[in-house]
Amino acid sequence: MAAPGFLPRPDFQHLLTALTAAGYLCLGPKVRDGAITYEELGSTDDLPRGVHDHQQPGAYRLHRDESPRCFSWANGPQALKPLLFAPRETLWTSAAGSDGGITFHPEIPEALPTAVIGVRACDLAALRLQDQHFLEGPSPDPHYGIRRRNLFLVAVHCT
């Protein structure tokens, strides 16, 4: 893992352009249906500026102001998990052999290289736990592994 660094705002678009040129689908925070969700980013202009959240038990509301800040909210209702686990997928197929036996063939998904902009420390901590279980355990999950290897994360500091 690379050492953390600071990316000045004028260089942020260069990062998105480089990731896109390298074949990554760039996802980042956007406002949809009153919540912050990860969606495709075309440019840094797509990032919501001046959006803040107010959370309490049973409530989640977004508010806007004139602030130029792009990441001034806590985590939204969406996490990284949907990017790593498909709701349904074929794990294997089988075929009957001429000898009457059955042959099983694993189905390994193709994963699009995906860059996620705006990941929080709590997301990284949860991802580490998933990695321990699904990559480093006694039976690594190849489906999780291929998606995880194709994931590029850009974290932001929670203040």
Ranges and model annotations:
Residues 1-159:
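Iron-sulfur-associated redox domains of electron-transfer enzymes in respiratory
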